[in-house]
Amino acid sequence: PKTIAGGICDGLWGYADDGTHTLNYIRRSEGYALAVSDEEIKAAQIYLAQKEGLFVEPSGAAGVAGLVKSDSGGMIGADSCVIVILSGHGLKDMRVLGEFDIPVIDNDVRELIKIVED
């Protein structure tokens, strides 16, 4: 499949046991796996950068996209403990930067302060 999350989309050639182990862990924990779209991944990547100050690559943001999808689908209980591991620095794949409205300011600390305070 073609996706922006190339780091997690492969055929596991040469390490097929990783997929088997992953499925076993999901089954033992009574968990689940789900698919997320490139748009959901980009939305998670942008959210993480803008709201949390974390710039992760698309593969790293896929877990947050899955969390959002699971929550909106009612799959996460109010008393659930959820952990999402974020990996892969955003500089590995910077395509999402085109989605940001990045302000350009003069070389003046007062302009920077204004941007930060807004």
Predicted regions and their residues:
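Glycine-rich beta-alpha junction loops
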Residues: I8, L12, E39-E40, G60-A62, ...
